[in-house]
Curated annotation (Swiss-Prot):
Family indicated by similarity: Belongs to the UvrB family.
Protein name: UvrABC system protein B
Keyword Metal-binding: no
Gene name, Swiss-Prot/TrEMBL: uvrB
Main location: cytoplasm
UniProt keyword annotations, A-Z: ATP-binding, Cytoplasm, DNA damage, DNA excision, DNA repair, Excision nuclease, Nucleotide-binding, SOS response
Species for this entry: Streptococcus pyogenes serotype M28 (strain MGAS6180)
Motif (Beta-hairpin): 97-120
């Protein structure tokens, strides 16, 4: 195994100091962790600085920490914030590296086989390698991840044991090093020097680790001994400085040595023979032929190259696992005594539970029809109970914890006071009779004060009818539905903030992650229709959208008071009472949050003038112009990723895909 560097403590850097009930929350969470408490809930209202509290806890308990978010966008936001709080420590980002992913599948009804098709984001692949190598080299590591962290990744022991350790003065020949690099999936490329490659010039070997993007390493030999090792700029070759120890981890997470490879191939062949016998006994000759052809090709590739497309489907044999045994995941790269934080746990834990079943249903079809061996079923995400077995200590973070989290612990730490002094909004319940006229009057009041309005409906038809009605009444309104692409959704939110329009109508899009301080009114139609979007948790999340403005107000239109409505209203009133008392005791005057409005992405046309998406008519562009636009966008996407603005990079990626579909 790799010797980890000396323990380096987490060092939190921030211009803020804990305020409101943050100090109490931080102290309670830390005391409970140090006291051995396994699970806790941080029940933090919208806008109370939960990420800052999480950072304070990490810095005080000083444990490697995994933070899991329920989508890439939120993970990117958290990564950026933790990176600012811990500039001297290893803050890593681990999400799915696919820009586009079509999983392998088979549809028996139409006899359609869909081959796996994917586009890997090179920047995210680099960050994934950076995360795993950091975890094996040091302890001061925070990894912000999506639920990708519960998917199979390859054995951390094989990954660490395959690493090549180099020091000046070490006796090793140049050719031996080259062979070792090839064994761990590095490619020789003397022309195009990029991640996962090495090049050779006489007695000098330059290696570009998979976890880097700008800096590579130069290993200089004197005979069969390493003379010196330098860190260099990959583009210019300029020396940055000498290093006294270099560890090169494999260029892929699925790696095995020659001895294990032969053992793995023998197991694959044995399973193939068994499955072929089964198919032939059932008269499934087509399936048998299909399976033999595909598996024998993969075996040949593994034998000759040490790798094959879809190698992860053989991971059970490569890792030496028993049938049904869970795969290795990112969680296995952490030491035993690590901390897990689940952001927006009411959403994330549901995702963790659901991943396994969907994956198994698709793969079972591939196995039944001879596209994969049964062992492919063991290349899968963890079941929830398997995830739980990795948990040493965990903090669930949410404004509305789910039933699962509440069943795991009775330790709930509340964080209700906002540093800005903002209160939870007041709530009115009004009858649905005459709601259109009443709502129109409320909207006009907000327009007069240059404030914005969210309206949430239960059905697409209701949203469309309401949009048409408000437009007829002269209101500047937009309807945001599920068909709208990520980039366009961001533009709609930006236009709402700028006042291009005043009212935004949606169904399930106005909950977590939509942060518009200009919104002072949230109207909930059909609030008394019990269900997923009108349960207590959904209502509290929707109410939270009005908690960023000092004049925040919520109107529920309903003909009866449901239990969910009453609980949401009571909880909001309880929080509001605590907030008012705190403000009064400390002389705090609530202020609306001030938040910059980020500019739209602009791209270069043939004239090289920066023109936003709104101003560009892609439909009328020639194919050549669209190609130039795509090239410019790809460059800007790379720049955004390098600046760690993954939300922006994801938006650019979505626009690139839209443009490519036009050709």
């Amino acid at each position: 195994m790799i010797d980890k560097r000396d323990d380096k403590p987490f060092k939190l850097k921030s211009k803020y100091k804990p305020s409101g009930d943050q100090p109490q929350a931080i102290e309670s969470l830390v005391d409970n962790i140090e006291g051995g408490e396994k699970a806790q809930i941080l029940l933090g209202a919208t806008g109370t600085g939960k990420t800052y509290t999480m950072s304070q806890v990490i810095s005080k308990v000083n444990k490697p920490t995994l933070v899991i978010a329920h989508n890439k966008t939120l993970a990117g936001q958290l990564y950026g914030e933790f990176k600012e709080f811990f500039p001297d420590n290893a803050v890593e980002y681990f999400v799915s590296y696919y820009d586009y992913y079509q999983p392998e599948a088979y549809v028996p009804s139409s006899d359609t086989y869909i081959e796996k098709d994917s586009s890997v984001n090179d920047e995210i692949d680099k960050l994934r390698h950076s995360a795993t190598s950091s975890l094996l080299e040091r302890n001061d590591v925070i990894v912000v991840a999506s639920v990708s962290c519960i998917y199979g990744l390859g054995s951390p022991k094989e990954y660490a044991d395959s690493a090549v350790s180099l020091r000046p003065g070490q006796e090793i020949s140049r050719d031996t090093l080259l062979n070792q690099l090839v064994d761990i999936q590095f490619e020789r490329n003397d022309i195009d020097f990029q991640r996962g490659c090495f090049r050779v010039r006489g007695d000098v070997v330059e290696v570009f680790p998979a976890s880097r993007d700008e800096h590579a390493f130069r290993v200089e030999f004197f005979g069969d001994e390493i003379d010196r090792i330098c860190e260099i700029e990959s583009l210019t070759g300029k020396t940055i400085g000498e290093v006294d120890h270099l560890v090169l981890f494999p260029a892929t997470h699925f790696v095995t040595n020659d001895e294990h490879m032969e053992q793995s191939i023998a197991k694959i062949q044995a399973e193939l023979a068994e499955q072929l016998q089964l198919f032939e006994s059932e008269g499934k000759l087509l399936e048998a032929q299909r399976l033999r052809q595909r598996t024998e090709y993969d075996i040949e590739m593994l034998r000759e190259m040490g790798y094959t497309s879809g190698v992860e489907n053989y991971s059970r044999h490569m890792d030496g696992r028993s049938p049904g045994e869970p795969p290795y995941t990112l969680l296995d790269f952490f030491p035993e005594d690590f901390l897990i934080m689940i952001d927006e746990s009411h959403m994330t834990m549901g995702q963790i539970k659901g991943m396994y079943n969907g994956d198994q249903a698709r793969k079972q079809m591939l196995v039944d029809y001879g596209f994969r061996l049964p062992s492919a079923l063991d290349n899968r995400p963890l079941r929830r109970e398997e995830f739980e077995s990795h948990v040493h200590q965990i903090i669930y973070v949410s404004a509305t914890p789910g039933e699962y989290e509440m069943s795991q612990t009775n330790t709930i730490i509340e964080q209700i006071i906002r540093p800005t002094g903002l209160l939870d909004p007041e709530i009115d319940v009004r009858p649905s009779m005459g709601q259109m006229d009443d709502l129109l009057g409320e909207i006009n009041q907000r327009v007069a004060r240059d404030e914005r309005t969210f309206i949430t409906t239960l059905t697409k038809k209701m949203a469309e009818d309401l949009t048409d009605y408000l437009k007829e009444m002269g209101v500047k309104v937009k309807y945001m539905h599920s068909d709208i692409k990520t980039l366009e959704r961001t533009e709609i939110i930006r236009d709402l903030r700028l006042g291009v329009f005043d009212v935004l109508i949606g169904i399930n899009l106005l909950r977590e992650g939509i942060d518009v301080p200009e919104v002072s009114l949230v109207a909930i139609l059909d609030a008394d229709k019990e269900g997923f979007l009108r349960n207590e948790r959904g209502l509290i999340q929707t109410i939270g959208r009005a908690a960023r403005n000092v004049d925040g107000h919520v109107i529920m239109y309903a003909d009866k008071m449901t239990d969910s409505m009453q609980r949401a209203i009571d909880e909001t009133a309880r929080r509001r009472e605590i907030q008012i008392a705190y403000n009064k005791a400390h002389g705090i005057v609530p202020q609306t949050i001030k938040k910059d409005i980020r500019g739209l992405i602009s791209i270069s046309k043939t004239s090289h003038n920066d023109i936003s998406k709104e101003e560009m008519d892609y439909e009328s562009m020639s194919r050549g112009e669209r190609k130039e636009a795509i090239n410019a966008l790809q460059k800007q996407m790379q720049e955004a990723a390098e600046l760690l603005d993954f939300e922006l990079a994801a938006q650019m990626r979505d626009l690139i895909l839209e443009l490519k579909l036009m050709d």
